[in-house]
Amino acid sequence: MNLHEYQAKQLFARYGLPAPAGYACTTPREAEEAASKIGSGPWVVKCQVHAGGRGKAGGVKVVNSKEEIRAFAEQWLGKRLVTYQTDAQGQPVRQILVEAATDIAKELYLGAVVDRGTRRVVFMASTEGGVEIEKVAEETPELIHKAIIDPLIGPMSYQGRELAFKLGLTGKQVSQFTKIFLGLANLFLERDLALVEINPLVITTQGDLICLDGKLGADGNALFRQAELREMHDPSQEDPREAQAAQWELNYVALDGNIGCMVNGAGLAMGTMDIVKLHGGAPANFLDVGGGATKERVTEAFKIILSDENVKAVLVNIFGGIVRCDLIADGIIGAVEEVGVHVPVVVRLEGNNAELGAKKLADSGLNIIAATSLTDAAKQAVAAVEAK
């Protein structure tokens, strides 16, 4: 679960991380009042969306008057911002962040993720701030410096100092960076985060370090014990279908194709998408109903898939292990009858009670295409789309 920049900076403040004075605003009037609270300009106004590339899309602007702030707020509040990280519809702008402008001498990068290889939280720092860290990692990996956090010990001051020296910091900047490093590490661990980025972490013309931007991603599996983070959830930034799927504990990701896929198991779901692509099709989604699929969840999965107007056929690929194929068949029949499916449905069942499930589908009298293998299922789904 991602947080907005203004929410990230609210948490930064609690952990002693310096950031520009700022306020999140929902109306043009609030934005003007925020400028008055901050003091004299210039100010920076930023659209709050869960996507990068805001600046290039016009969603970040340096302004010198309250009239410009009002104009920016009127331009963007209630509208949608399209960046290279969004789809063609963009993300809705419900708040803008008004904050004091900062005189920048140099831009740095500081971030942390969970490294699956070492099973540790890994901090990354670089002198190449203000650009995508993925690009730096690909083109100049030697410019990324790392610190691995031992889960039994936690973050140590010496790790912060080591990173500071590698970034070329001197004097008071070393102690400032170490404080930021320790605060960010404690924030990451105590709040069950999966990602944190300060990009850029800037050195001002006065020589001080300031967190100019903030990006936080919370571990969705830990939200049950992070009540405050749950309250920060902004469903407007999610695909409505993905949000609906989450309520039913379905793993759904919307894609750009036209063949809806319903599969049990993430690995099988990815394999199904691959083989659809191999035979000339384009998956409309990733959808894993999981090992505990019920008739109700299968019905809901169908509703979610068919709510995508681009879907021209549905491919159901079930390997019965924990889940019984006959229960899946009941769910498919119930969904087709309830929703009124008007696109071809191709079903491949294997494993636990597969024969019983296939018989139920055959006896239902519904227009369901039975597949003998995964390859056959993919070919039939692609053919069904091409025939429409």
Swiss-Prot record:
Origin organism lineage: Bacteria, Pseudomonadati, Pseudomonadota, Gammaproteobacteria, Enterobacterales
Could you say which cofactors this protein requires? Mg(2+)
Q: Could you tell me what the cofactor note in this record states?
A: Binds 1 Mg(2+) ion per subunit.
Q: Give residue ranges for domain ATP-grasp.
A: 9-244
Q: How does it assemble?
A: Heterotetramer of two alpha and two beta subunits.
Give the reaction(s) catalysed.
succinate + ATP + CoA = succinyl-CoA + ADP + phosphate; GTP + succinate + CoA = succinyl-CoA + GDP + phosphate
Q: What is this protein called?
A: Succinate--CoA ligase [ADP-forming] subunit beta
Q: Which InterPro entries match?
A: ATP-grasp (IPR011761), ATP-grasp_succ-CoA_synth-type (IPR013650), ATP_grasp_subdomain_1 (IPR013815), Succ-CoA_synthase_bsu_CS (IPR017866), SUCC_ACL_C (IPR005811), Succ_CoA_ligase-like_bsu (IPR005809), Succinyl-CoA_synth-like (IPR016102)
Q: Gene name, please?
A: sucC
| Single GO cellular component term | cytosol
* Enzyme Commission number(s): 6.2.1.5
**Binding positions for Mg(2+)?**
199, 213
Name the protein family. Answer: Belongs to the succinate/malate CoA ligase beta subunit family.
Q: Name one GO molecular function term.
A: succinate-CoA ligase (GDP-forming) activity
Q: To which pathway does this protein belong?
A: Carbohydrate metabolism; tricarboxylic acid cycle; succinate from succinyl-CoA (ligase route): step 1/1
Keywords per UniProt: ATP-binding, Ligase, Magnesium, Metal-binding, Nucleotide-binding, Tricarboxylic acid cycle
Enzyme class label: ligase
Record function comment? Succinyl-CoA synthetase functions in the citric acid cycle (TCA), coupling the hydrolysis of succinyl-CoA to the synthesis of either ATP or GTP and thus represents the only step of substrate-level phosphorylation in the TCA. The beta subunit provides nucleotide specificity of the enzyme and binds the substrate succinate, while the binding sites for coenzyme A and phosphate are found in the alpha subunit.
Keyword DNA-binding assigned to the entry: answer is no
Binding site residues for substrate = 264, 321-323
Q: Where does ATP bind?
A: 46, 53-55, 99, 102, 107
